Amino acid sequence: MRATQHSTLNSQLSSSLFLTGTDTGVGKTHVAQLLVRRFRREGLDCVGMKPICCGGREDAELLHAASEAAIPLNDVNPVWLRPPAAPYTAAIIENRPIDLALIRETFTRLRAAHPSLIVEGVGGWRVPIARDFFVSDLAAECGLPVVVVVANRLGAINHTLLTVESIRAHGLVCAGIILNHTTAAGEIPDIAETTNRSVLEDLLDVPILFEIAHGQMAVALSPLECGGRA
């Protein structure tokens, strides 16, 4: 079934979302900060949250800046592990368990204080946070509509189908897909990049909300048609 098209970003998206990806490094943080900035420009008190950072803290700093420092950096990112690995692995290396209670308390407080909250997961949908707790479980606890960021490249179809299937298996709503282009302006996209959208629309009953061009620094404020890039 083809995805239903909508005319504006607000009609497509709740202003509070859980953002996941088909993998690590697909552009979740870039998309998250674009959404936070977009909603704030529309007058919403929107802030970003990345509950867990592993390695550097640059992702949290970008969300903090997008939120115009409306909340402390430690609320944007309550748990920071230095090893650049999956949270479960990083916690073992640091010999300190991840403080899930702190994440839950911070999320609950931000959700109550701000009408718009963009939560960015860490890595992909099934990345382990603890031995028996995954990103998917964190999303389920947050209870927000889930949007999947997809790097538009070879392999995207399989990764997207598996991710959407798992989201639904966890009883959550997949609110849509955002295609993030990896080919820079002036480069010739390959056949996968030029066909992934139409194939995903044919195979999934999930809307492709919009596409992000490589290096794009804003989501248009004008009405956004799903038929082309944002």
Named regions from a protein language model:
Residues 4-13:
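Arg/Gly-rich low-complexity intrinsically disordered repeat tracts
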Residues 16, 30-97, 101, 106-109:
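N-terminal phosphate/diphosphate-binding loop that engages ATP/GTP or pyrophosphate donors
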Residues 19-20:
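Hydrophobic anchor at the beta1->P-loop junction of P-loop NTPases
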Residues 25, 34-35, 54, 122-211:
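Conserved catalytic-core segment of NTP-binding enzymes
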Residues 81-82, 209, 214-220:
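A short acidic, often aromatic-flanked loop/helix-cap motif at beta-alpha or helix-coil junctions
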Residues 103, 107-130:
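Switch II (G3) loop of P-loop NTPases
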